[in-house]
């Protein structure tokens, strides 16, 4: 007992606050350990260019996740979710069971099957912000903050945000500090926390 009291007092002696500093959670960004060989990631892990795909650094563990991509330069691109088994060198994604993506033509693909499509008059253009919600069942697309009512589903397992580019496309990712307020109940990606 005396040892435990001494331990507690030791934290407070010499004007100490008794607080133990907590580690700051890392920021979610594009993961250079999980990207295609011809992909270039810049702007502190927030911009993708080159050719190929890249996963984000954190999986979608919470029930309702939201993230955004801003189209800086048009070309061939796709955004959505994927497992770590996806081939990030083989684009377009959405051709197998390991990815569910919306492509630049507005089609949502999973397992080489078109699951849904944006209205023809609502295709994302340069400067637009595309938001993605995912609730472990359904992926939904938002264009400049507006729900496109274009759900798609089918992917299983632990998924990560994914983006791919080709043909001079440049996209910026936002995993926090969003351009548009997430829909009710959805929030930024949270790192899974472990307490030892």
Swiss-Prot record:
Q: Which SMART domains match?
A: SPRY (SM00449)
As stated in the Swiss-Prot or TrEMBL entry, residues carrying the post-translational modification N-acetylalanine are 2
Domain called B30.2/SPRY: residue spans: 2-184
Which keywords does this Swiss-Prot/TrEMBL entry list?
A: Acetylation
Specify one Pfam family: SPRY
Q: Does the keyword Acetylation apply?
A: yes
Protein name, entry field = SPRY domain-containing protein 7
- What organism does the UniProt record list as the source? Bos taurus
């Amino acid at each position: 007992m005396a040892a435990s009291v001494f331990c507690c007092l030791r934290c407070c002696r010499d004007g100490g606050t008794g607080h133990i500093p907590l580690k700051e959670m890392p920021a979610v960004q594009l993961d250079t350990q999980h990207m295609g060989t011809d992909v270039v990631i810049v702007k502190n892990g927030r911009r993708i260019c080159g050719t190929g795909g890249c996963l984000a650094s954190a999986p979608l563990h919470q029930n309702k996740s939201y993230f955004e991509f801003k189209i800086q330069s048009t070309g061939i691109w796709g955004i959505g979710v994927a497992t770590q088994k996806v081939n990030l060198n083989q684009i377009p994604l959405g051709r197998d069971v390991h990815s569910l993506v919306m492509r630049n033509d507005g089609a949502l693909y999973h397992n080489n099957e078109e699951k849904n499509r944006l209205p023809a008059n609502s295709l994302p253009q340069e400067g637009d912000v595309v938001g993605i919600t995912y609730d472990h069942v359904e992926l939904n697309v938002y264009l400049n903050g507006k729900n496109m009512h274009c759900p798609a589903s089918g992917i299983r397992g632990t998924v990560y945000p994914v983006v791919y580019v080709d043909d001079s496309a440049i996209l910026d990712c936002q995993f926090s500090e969003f351009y548009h307020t997430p829909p009710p109940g959805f929030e930024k990606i949270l790192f899974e926390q472990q307490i030892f």
